[in-house]
Amino acid sequence: MMKKNKPTVAQTLSPEEEQAKFFEEAKNNVMIQGHHMKLSLDNSKLMDALKYASNIINELRTSLLSPKSYYALYLVAFDYLQYLNTYLYEEKHGKKMIELYEVVQHAGNVLPRLYLLITVGSVYIKTKQAPAKDVLKDLIEMCRGVQHPTRGLFLRHYLSEVTKDKLPDIDSSVENGTVMDSIDFIIQNFTETNKLWVRMQHQAPTKDRERRENERLELRLLVGKNLSRLAQLDGVDQKTYSEVVLPKVVEQIINCKDKIAQQYLMEILIQVFPDEFHLATLDIILQTCAQLQSGVDVKTIIASLIDRLANFATRNADLVPDNIKIFDIFFNNVKEIIQARPNMELQDILGLHVSLLNLTLKCYPTNKDNANEVLGLCQSIIVNKAKEDINKPTCVKQIIQLLQIPLDVFKNVLVVLKLSNYQPLISCLSYNNRKKVSLDIVNNTINNSTIIEEPEAVNNLLETIQTLIKDEQDQPDMDDIDKEDFQEEQNKVASLIHLFDSEDPEKLFKIYIIARGHFGKGGPHRIRHTLVPLVFCSLRFIRNFKQQVDSGVISLDENKWIAIGSKIFTFVSETIKALADIKLADLSFRLYLQALQTFDHCGLVSRVKELAIKALLIFQEDIADFKAQVMALQLLISTLNSLSIPNEEIYESLAAQTIKQASRLLLPQDQAKLISTCSHLFWVDNPSRQYQNPDSVLQALKKALSIISNESSPGLGTFVDILNECLFYCDKETDAVPIQFVSDLVELIRTTHVKEADPALPYLQNTIKYIQSQNYKGISI
């Protein structure tokens, strides 16, 4: 019984595998034919070699290979043809070039015929057996015979490669050809090459269009090399470029109406020719950009040109003719291009503005109007765009860059704020981005230590960074804002106040009023940070002002001084009150005391009493924590003790109020300690003021002792505190505190309140040692 054969299944290759197979077959054939060609040449069999060379080129007639694979095959074939080229030039083959030139024209197929013609023709030119211009003209015309996009493209590339060192230039004889002949040859080849490259898009079905476009891009150098050849000709000077080369090149770029070709060719045009040429033909290039297809990325083209010319003008300012206004040309053309392209992406529009701004600040750093024009044009475009477009990350990045560039270049916020279109551009951003820009402005001001002397400039700055200063409609809820970041931002804003300064006191006070007006809108979360330094700067201001008056720098009579002091008092008082109104009691209390000392130093006594009363009022109504009350009273006593109030009635009234508040403290120990401390209010021994009231001193100490003695568990520490206060007056050798009173107090402590476990016992022992060391008369230990 016969076995049945298993049916064979045809193996299906993937497109990539199939392509690799076709390429390997073609390459192997080329290498086989190339091997035979070399053997024939080595044996001086030229006609056989030409036959094998024709066979090599026949492999390039294929339509099975992708452009990428075809390119690889072309390179293999090119190497063999170069071998033939070298042989024809170097070997004695017994034939004239004119004969060979005619022989190869009888090759059977068009493509091998033309490759061989070009190969022989290049040697024909090199051996100078025929004028270059005639051979080049003949070859360029014959290449029209191949209109297949891929085959024609590589044929013309071969023509360009093998003739590149044989083109007539400035040192050529007239008979051989001139540089104009070379220009005509290259431009004609460029035009036809580009047409073939553009036609490649139609070789693939619609569904494969994207793949074909990518393959086309891989071959772009074959077209661009023609422009490189033009740029390498020594005979192409600026005049020739402007009048001959550029018009023909841009005509082809515009007429091809292909976005890929237009994009690449404009980019390569800008790359290969010198900056001086572009400078002289700027209008033509930009007008060409305006005529490109809508899908062309003109932003990249123009930005590249701007960057190149900006760098050139910076390095070679003396080479830029006065009649060429680079910025004006770019600005006007860019504006027209944007208007002519209503569908142009916003990020591309913004990118052009960034390039324009960099251009003007590099080429015309002192011309602020140009920068302002760029910002103004940008702002006028943005206001008509949808918010979702403006807030795209790419667009936001460009806008912020536009706003950052002037800060980085000028390093002076005063210069930047004179750009009238700067602030309106900020307002186009979302809250978080406005805040970021505002922080950049603040950081720039601080880092460069920019002193702001004019009220108008201060107002302009604070209006510009208003996102940091007050609540805005589009800001997130305070609960959603990072507290540490917020505090850091507000601290930076507050530090600006120290950069507001002027030698003119009137201007400086006006600056503080303006700052207060802006900061006052900040709400409770902000003013706790911003108003405090404003208070201190205002107090420093009145001290300095008083010093100038006293030294005669400023001439002012007493009444005028009091009037000015009253204005500053009102300003400071209202500023502190704003903090008190948001329940910052402890802070407000301390600021009132600071102000109290300052106004006392300046001799404004009536204001001292008002400030002390305000401080006492806050103490009574708003400081509830008993520990905070103790600390506040200690601070108040110290402050009052340092004053130089000449009016004893006012001073004694304040001292009495202080004792009254001390007697209202929660804990008897605190009452006694603070009242004993109040005794110092009646014994002032300062260089600026002498005031002693022995009766009041003793009365305060007795009152303190009475309070603590009535406690069931008074504790030793408070008694020792009172004893130490008494010793202070003994050391002053005053009769305010009788020795007998001190002696009785010591005895009372030793007999009644000393317990072995009391933590204050070492305190008492040290005090006793001190008494013993001083040998007070009348105090027995």
UniProtKB/Swiss-Prot annotation:
GO terms, biological process: intracellular protein transport; protein retention in Golgi apparatus; retrograde transport, endosome to Golgi
Subcellular localization(s) per the UniProt record: Membrane; Endosome membrane
Domain of life assignment: Eukaryota
Membrane topology: Peripheral membrane protein
Disulfide-bond pairs as recorded: none
Main location: membrane
Keywords: Endosome, Membrane, Protein transport, Transport
Protein's UniProt keywords contain Protease: no
GO CC field: cytosol; endosome membrane; late endosome; pathogen-containing vacuole; retromer complex; retromer, cargo-selective complex
Quaternary assembly: Component of a retromer subcomplex consisting of vps29, vps26 and vps35.
Known function: Plays a role in vesicular protein sorting. Component of the membrane-associated retromer complex which is essential in endosome-to-Golgi retrograde transport. The vps29-vps26-vps35 subcomplex may be involved in cargo selection.
UniProt family annotation: Belongs to the VPS35 family.
Name of the molecule in the record: Vacuolar protein sorting-associated protein 35
